[in-house]
Amino acid sequence: MPDDFGNIMLKEWLKQRKLSIDKINPVDRLTYVGSRGMGALEYEPADNEENNNYNVNISELLEVAKRVLGDKREISYNNIDKDSLSDILRIGTSVGGARAKALIAIKFNSDNRIIEIKPGDIIQPEDYSYWILKIDGANEKTLGEGEGLGKIEYVYYLLAKEAGIEMSDSRIFEENNRFHFLTKRFDRTDKGDKIHMQTFGAIAGIDYKVQKASSYETLFRVMKRLRLPYYQFEQQYRRTLFNVIARNHDDHVKNFSFLMDKEGNWKISPAYDVNYSYSPGGTWTNVHQSSINGKFDNFTRGDLLNFGKIFGIKKANHILDEVITAVNQWSKIATEIDIPKKEIEARNKVLRVNNFNK
């Protein structure tokens, strides 16, 4: 179901149809999602229009996102026609999370350059692939505000890959001197076929809206129940260490997912929402949302290694050092991506690259 930013967009979509979000129930929300949601689950009868023929205007998408996030009682869309507005609101509702984002389908040319963008919540021709666009320049009150988050997330994508973490293909999309983060969907094949996906929170029955509701130990126990092979535990261990060292405190139960194939076999999804997410004064981001060894902060090297030992991780010492080495490239890679020096230095002061020395 839509959440956070998606609910804001849904509320505005309903408003355009002279309806109130207060008068719709959870079943109504599911019929609105219909066949357009993440993963493979579909809900019938679907209550939404499909228009796959129009091209997505990123500038208009950003403008709508900024307006609906502005908390204004009356929002004017005088420069956006009614059909475009409805389409923009629709593609912004079907993906979860707090940040402004949209589901899009992209057509690339032979040089791998974007030549056309269409709605990604429905099936497009075979020469399109399916992506999530995280919109730069909209107001994200929880995880940081203003422009520039797209570039920072891209740096974190590169750091995570350096740390041996499996990520979906990602890139920066520049538009009017804004830098949006694009990541390829792992719940769709290139042909648009759907792959069943469930979050850790959904499988374990844990509400992600409850702060500090879970632990990495619980995540690994769910993996055991799903009978995942050893290499996936090692992969998830790398992700755990990366979140700690790189200050990704947005490690709640919806930010870990599992994919199921047609034979019923589960695996962990590629890592996602891997980004700097730390604010000492933040309600959600002052500490981690998942604990290790009963702690949500102030971890020791012993905590991290003991956690690995409990779940049979081989060469945990070596893996920890590899992740530290990768995160230690923050300044170098951020400089290459043109992150402002002030931003680089501010994060350098709080990254935990020196906290776990032997």
Language-model-detected regions and their locations in the chain:
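Phosphate/dinucleotide-binding and metal-coordinating scaffold of catalytic cores
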Residues: 1-253, 257-358
